[in-house]
């Protein structure tokens, strides 16, 4: 076992017994919303995973230890620390460990820690991707590279709509990462149920998705799978309204010179401000929806 890794007793017991486990990321706790809403939301997501037949494993770095499965107290610790917690992707993990620090895991680093522990299914809000204007900036999320070679299925509401969805899709295709639509043939765009882009495959049941994952990994085809699960109709936002908010947020980001790992939190916060908090409510609901589907996929995978 990895000397830096702490797997919670509940998660360890489930993994040893071949029971379904769902990984959850921690950036949404530290960077996604303020205290105490962040911790409350994270605990609700864990409960939704349990209600749908799996064990939740929220993942983070706390005091220099890689944690797979957090206690309520650890979730609250991250929630209170908020933006003081380092947003940790692949490159950051060894340095946070070396200084005994705290890290909130992105999609990429959550996948890494999940794979270390043997967790195959991960629920998040949306994956990172190719940023708009990347042909000049080369700003491409490390999430995509992780998906290319780490064997974890990521259930999300598509790529965050602040990104260039077309280029994100092309990048995934280049790296052989399947883009699966759950009960949809078009790629959902986070706050909205559809976009101008198709998925590679539409699968309509958790069982079909689990069978495809088993076939992929049993054949030794390395890499993740993106399972795009549209936001529930009742919480989906108007496409025109959200596009206008994103355009305004992007313009302000350029004016202020925000870039790199700060760009996504800035844009999400600005879009929430412009939409009067509607985008944050939508974000929470799509995470709940993804957690439920991920638990059902994990239950089928381990059935």
UniProtKB/Swiss-Prot annotation:
Cross-referenced SUPFAM superfamilies: Indigoidine synthase A-like
Pfam families, sorted: Indigoidine_A (PF04227)
Keyword Hydrolase: yes
Binding annotation for Mn(2+): 139
Catalytic residue positions: 25 (proton donor), 160 (nucleophile)
Biological processes per GO annotation: nucleobase catabolic process
Cofactor notes: Binds 1 Mn(2+) ion per subunit.
Keywords noted in UniProt: Glycosidase, Hydrolase, Lyase, Manganese, Metal-binding
Reactions listed under catalytic activity: D-ribose 5-phosphate + uracil = psi-UMP + H2O
Subunit structure: Homotrimer.
Function, as annotated: Catalyzes the reversible cleavage of pseudouridine 5'-phosphate (PsiMP) to ribose 5-phosphate and uracil. Functions biologically in the cleavage direction, as part of a pseudouridine degradation pathway.
Protein's name in the database: Pseudouridine-5'-phosphate glycosidase
Lineage per the UniProt record: Bacteria, Pseudomonadati, Pseudomonadota, Gammaproteobacteria, Oceanospirillales
Name of encoding gene: psuG
């Amino acid at each position: 076992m990895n000397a830096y890794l702490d797997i919670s007793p509940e998660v360890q017991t489930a993994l040893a017994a071949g029971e379904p486990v769902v990984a959850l990321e921690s950036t949404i706790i530290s960077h996604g919303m303020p205290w105490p809403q962040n911790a409350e939301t994270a605990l609700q997501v864990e409960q939704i995973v349990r209600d749908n037949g799996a064990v939740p494993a929220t993942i983070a770095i706390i005091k220099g230890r890689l944690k797979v499965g957090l206690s309520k107290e650890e979730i609250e610790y991250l929630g209170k620390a908020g933006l003081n917690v380092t947003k940790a992707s692949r490159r950051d993990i060894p340095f946070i460990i070396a200084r005994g620090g705290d890290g909130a895991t992105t999609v990429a680093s959550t996948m890494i820690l999940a794979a270390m522990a043997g967790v195959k299914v991960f629920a998040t809000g949306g994956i990172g991707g190719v940023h708009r204007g990347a042909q000049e900036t080369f700003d491409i999320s490390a999430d995509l590279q992780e998906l290319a070679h780490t064997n974890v299925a990521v259930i999300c509401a598509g790529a965050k709509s602040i990104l260039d969805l077309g280029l994100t899709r092309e990048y995934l295709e280049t790296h052989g990462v399947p883009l699966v639509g759950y009960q949809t043939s078009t790629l959902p765009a986070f706050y909205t149920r559809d976009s101008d882009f198709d998925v590679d495959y539409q699968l309509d049941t958790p069982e079909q998705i689990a069978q495809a994952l088993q076939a992929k990994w049993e054949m030794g085809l390395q890499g993740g799978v993106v399972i795009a699960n549209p936001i529930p109709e009742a919480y989906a936002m108007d496409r025109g309204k959200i596009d206008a908010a994103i355009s305004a947020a992007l313009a302000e980001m350029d004016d202020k010179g925000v870039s790199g790992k700060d760009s996504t939190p800035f844009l999400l916060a600005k879009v929430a401000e412009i939409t009067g908090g509607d985008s944050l409510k939508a974000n929470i609901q799509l995470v709940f929806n993804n957690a439920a589907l991920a638990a059902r996929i994990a239950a089928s995978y381990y059935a």
